[in-house]
Amino acid sequence: MPFRIANVWEMTGDDKADIKFGKMPDKIQKKMLRTSLRKAGKLLQTAARGMVAKDSGALRASIKPKAAKRSRKNKHIIAVRVMTSSKAYKGEYFPGGHVEYGTQFQSANPFMRPAADQVRSQVIAYFKQDLKAAIAESGKGK
């Protein structure tokens, strides 16, 4: 399994929204979570793309958000990952990892961690707002 640069955050939600959300069918929960996570992940994607070196643009283009799967043990823990694509691998060479962490010949030029630190609170706030809006919208349809 290739190494991927990723930032995974865990957070807890609002109790009232959690109760409404828990009463919904699993399929609807999953769809709402993934949609809200992807939207929130785009904030981190934009920040990371802005901080990465612009040489060929391939590394910048490979940075994409992905909604991680929920844990079966605790369905209340969800995650969004923004990572470089596996298409960026070139044999033994992984440009994302080499740029972020450096090598023995190249100094590190971090872009993913600083981007995550910069927009963390915005991503969490946006996700909570978007998910609450989706829950409220689904309640109006009944």
Protein language model regions, located:
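Short, Lys/Arg-rich flexible segments
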Residues: 1-79, 83, 87, 96-142
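Carboxylate-rich helix-loop segments that flank metal/cofactor sites and access channels
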Residues: 90-91
